[in-house]
Amino acid sequence: MDVSGQETDWRSAAFRQKLVSQIEDAMRKAGVAHSKSSKDMESHVFLKAKTRDEYLSLVARLIIHFRDIHNKKSQASVSDPMNALQSLTGGPTPGAAGIGMPPRGPGQSLGGMGGLGAMGQPLPLSGQPPPGTSGMAPHGMAVVSTATPQTQLQLQQVALQQQQQQQQQQQFQQQQAALQQQQQQQQQQQQQQQFQAQQNAMQQQFQAVVQQQQLQQQQQQQHLIKLHHQSQQQQIQQQQLQRMAQLQLQQQQQQQQQQALQAQPPMQQPSMQQPQPPPSQALPQQLSQLHHPQHHQPPPQAQQSPIAQNQPPQIPPQSQSQPLVSQAQALPGPMLYAAQQQLKFVRAPMVVQQPQVQPQVQQVQPQVQPQAAVQAAQSAQMVAPGVQMIAEALAQGGMHVRARFPPTSTMSAGPSSSISLGGQPTTQVSQSSLTMLSSPSPGQQVQTPQSMPPPPQPSPQPGSQPNSNVSSGPAPSPSSFLPSPSPQPSQSPVTARTPQNFSVPSPGPLNTPVNPSSVMSPAGSSQAEEQQYLDKLKQLSKYIEPLRRMINKIDKNEDRKKDLSKMKSLLDILTDPSKRCPLKTLQKCEIALEKLKNDMAVPTPPPPPVLPTKQQDLCQPLLDAVLANIRSPVFNHSLYRTFVPAMMAIHGPPIVSPVVCSRKRRFEEDERQSIPNVLQGEVARLDPKFLVNLDPSHCSNNGTVHLICKLDDKDLPSVPPLELSVPADYPAQSPMWIDRQWQYDANPFLQSVHRCMTSRLLQLPDKHSVTALLNTWAQSIHQACLSAA
């Protein structure tokens, strides 16, 4: 076969039409719609190909592309076949992604290549024919007959390269998938470990909380058990006291009638100093004598005598009236001696001064049964033994009784007991103040408890011992209940309902342990704090008006809402009397106002007036006026207007340098000189960095204009101005630079500017403009800067 005939045969229309029909058949089987027809694709391939082999290889690849689409319809992302052809013309790239061929196994036949084999046989791969069908098109015989062995080898090599590259891509993708799976497994393991650690920590915290709750429950149960035991002990002791009181009543009822007649003479002796109270009030008066010293001595918590350490300090209200009334009678014989001995034993530890003791006070009900009151009125002479008996019973039972006293004149000024840091009243009792317990004299101070309003109820303090009662009010001063050495009758405020009480001197000397005037009472301290508060408020009143002005000023400013709220709260504290705040808060407000003082422009108070002395300065009134007006905005103007005329009258006009007068010109010369319009227009169009003015020192009648040019450029240094002489027939003649070399001899930089300017002027053409001359000047300065750098 003639090779030249084959080379020219592929360009014929019949040959090309066969390939067009084959491409059309492949497109129809693939079922893919394209914007370009098979004829367009073939013509594109025909234009790209240079030889027959290249033309056949491109058509074969196009057919293979469509048949792969037919075999792999599941793949939707198929690239444009025309783009694939364009990428194939330059040779297969690594990866062969531009061809758009899906991967095939090594045993699968090339469907589109079957039409190019000799006699319709499929192309053998690896030397062995594959078991698949040939896949030849029915009208592809003409193409087969024209194929050469070289084309077959090229197509086989291309297919093998594509398969190898696709296999490598598959392996790489598999490796990446395996790596991603390993990373996901590691992340899952880490998350599981973190979750387990969090669960363990939460379990430990929950166990700790449960243990704490169990411990608290156990402590509460133990506390309740203790309370129950103590209440049982109190009930037992109260029953014993009631039995003793009943025995004493039975013994005393037999002796009441005989002793009533004998008790009248000793009771009439002190009646000259003190009126005898009615019989119905005898027993409460006896009780009040007992309760005087015990009211001064608050019971300590841990320093009580060994007899009363483990005894409960409370008595229920329902069991108070009967034992106290019944114990007001006397004990006969040996019981009286025993009571006195025990009373001395109880009194000994009570002498010690005990600071900071919480008073555990129990109220005593003054209600007396009618029968017991009548019996007590008939046995008035048994006051002292009855007092000793009650003291003995109180010491054995650990009870601390506080009677209801009417307010005396010493209490009207407020309680004067000294207050410790913890708010607990502290009282000091000397041994002499306790002699009223043992002295049987009936002339002691007597006060009736009937008309006194009840004291505040004791409230148990949480967190302390369960049986300790703390009075809600401060303990009364000891001096208000002790008889004074100089007796003065003190009238009770409730004299309408109670008989008058007179203070009678005690037989034994008494030393008052506490001076009420030396201890600052709560009422006095609060009065001092009130005075300090009012003084501080008066001191801060100067900030009210500036603060209001500041609030009105920034009221509409959205950025300072926080400052506005602070200022309004400060103004409320200063102006609203209902909003009372502690003194410390007021001091903090003062600090805040001091910080805002500059913003508010608080008027400074005038300086304190200077006391007139004999050597007072003559100009002191003037200095005072200056100090008063020194903050005025027109202060300098006022000083100038006031003092300059006087200073000029004294010293004369100020000395100034003489003004350099320029050469005067006549008006006729000014009228003759005019600037040409050409020059005016050029100057108006100059760069703004050039400032051009007329030279006032030159004036010529021949039409020449002298200009002074200054350079105002932020990127260039300051240099002497440029002087130009523009002729009258400008622009027919060029302007001239008036060289003043002495201005450039100041430093090396200016000398460099002068040299550059001279050299550049020589390069200008014969006819040049003012603009060209000024640009040359600026370039010379720039060149000098570069050379200096």
Swiss-Prot record:
Residues 88-140, 257-326, 404-531 are annotated as: Disordered. The modification Asymmetric dimethylarginine is found at R347. InterPro entries: KIX_dom_sf, Med15_C, Med15_central, Med15_N. Residues 407-426, 494-504, 512-530 have a biased composition (Polar residues). Residues 89-102, 257-274, 282-291, 302-326, 427-450, 464-483 have a biased composition (Low complexity). Ubiquitinated by TRIM11, leading to proteasomal degradation. Component of the Mediator complex, which is composed of MED1, MED4, MED6, MED7, MED8, MED9, MED10, MED11, MED12, MED13, MED13L, MED14, MED15, MED16, MED17, MED18, MED19, MED20, MED21, MED22, MED23, MED24, MED25, MED26, MED27, MED29, MED30, MED31, CCNC, CDK8 and CDC2L6/CDK11. The MED12, MED13, CCNC and CDK8 subunits form a distinct module termed the CDK8 module. Mediator containing the CDK8 module is less active than Mediator lacking this module in supporting transcriptional activation. Component of the Mediator complex, a coactivator involved in the regulated transcription of nearly all RNA polymerase II-dependent genes. Mediator functions as a bridge to convey information from gene-specific regulatory proteins to the basal RNA polymerase II transcription machinery. Mediator is recruited to promoters by direct interactions with regulatory proteins and serves as a scaffold for the assembly of a functional preinitiation complex with RNA polymerase II and the general transcription factors. Required for cholesterol-dependent gene regulation. PANTHER family: MEDIATOR OF RNA POLYMERASE II TRANSCRIPTION SUBUNIT 15. This is Mediator of RNA polymerase II transcription subunit 15. It comes from Mus musculus (Mouse). The lineage of its organism: Eukaryota, Metazoa, Chordata, Craniata, Vertebrata.
